[in-house]
Amino acid sequence: MEEYQIYQGFPTEWLGAWESINGNPDVYIFQGYDGNYYLLGYNYDKESERGNFSCYDMNADENGWYIRMGMKCCLLMSESSPYGLHITSWGSYMKS
């Protein structure tokens, strides 16, 4: 039997679609069948008329929830109105 890591204290208000307020990729946060949380980023290039998807594992440590892009960690934090979510290096997001 496989053992899955269950994360306690995940901010469930983060689940769902988020729009970037400053042109960074829009994101969708979801829980997979394996019980883990993921962030799906979508970026649309108007010049080439193509979209690009990237999926990141969400992990937690003593500093909070984060995604890893290569060697870089981007921390996710709740933000007060009118936005709701802040991702380090990507900026603020509003719930779609």
Task: Describe the role of every protein-language-model region.
Residues 1-7, 21-26, 59-96:
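Beta-sheet ligand-binding and adhesion/scaffold domains
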Residues 2-17, 30-31:
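N-terminal helix-cap/turn-to-beta initiation motif at the start of protein domains
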Residues 12-13, 33-36, 79-81:
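A short, compositionally biased
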Residues 16, 49-50, 75:
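Intrinsically disordered, low-complexity segments enriched in glycine/proline and serine/threonine
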Residues 16, 22, 45-46, 67:
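Generic ordered-secondary-structure signal
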Residues 24-62:
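N-terminal glycine/threonine-rich, aromatic-flanked beta-hairpin/loop signature
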